[in-house]
């Protein structure tokens, strides 16, 4: 995978996690214990997978920053994208902890 693919995959995982979080919250409101457990587990799984992908992306960038094509503007753009993702990841983590 390249940086763009990692970023897209992480964003998809975070979106999935949030979707499952809201379903779990709705199930809790409806007193559906089984659905709550099911969706909560899926939300955490997606969130944890995003964390694994972050680590892989960091390693990928460390290897690629030595290449000229990743210097300058491209590197800056990837770093900005990653910072936005880190904020989304933190927001997801905070919501999951509250559930």
Model-derived segments and spans:
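Non-heme di-metal
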Residues: 1-99
